[in-house]
UniProtKB/Swiss-Prot annotation:
One of its GO terms (cellular component) is cytosol. Pfam families: UPF0149. Belongs to the UPF0149 family. This is UPF0149 protein PputGB1_5261.
Amino acid sequence: MPNTQSPYIAFAMLLSSNGHPVTPAELHGLLIGRSCAGAGFDADAWLADAAQLLETEPGDTVRNALIGLQEMVKGELNSDDMAIVLLLPSDDAALSDRATALGQWCQGFITGFGLNAGGKDLSDEAKDVLQDLVAISQVQEALEESEDGESDYMEVMEYLRVAPLLLFSELAKPAAPAPKPSLH
């Protein structure tokens, strides 16, 4: 039985009860994708991108949740942990549900990245990450309820916790300030 107290389910219920036909995974992917493309962390710009996916302007409760999500992501991307926490169903959800959400997360990421990358030059490694995300978004139905399927899911999820950081460090991470010249 799925954990009704999980952040994913709570966010899904909030979105659904406010008439937004989108999953938390897709919204989180959108946010991470746009952030990794260098969109910055301006709340109004994030809310404008999110409103396209939500299909309507968010009310105050959803708006506040989206701003909170952005603050969490900002902290993760700017920390030294070198991993992000994916907003996905908990481990007690059916593997098919988790795999579907993983694919939706990747679709959201690709959309967010595409809306904000604006023709930036990418390294070969960054292009490989984007190709991987496209492939993962399309194979969500391929995982079977088995130990191998579970293992494959965990492997992909671990990859997605670190791979976007390559894009963020390449395109969005602020450069370290140059040392100030000293006066002699």
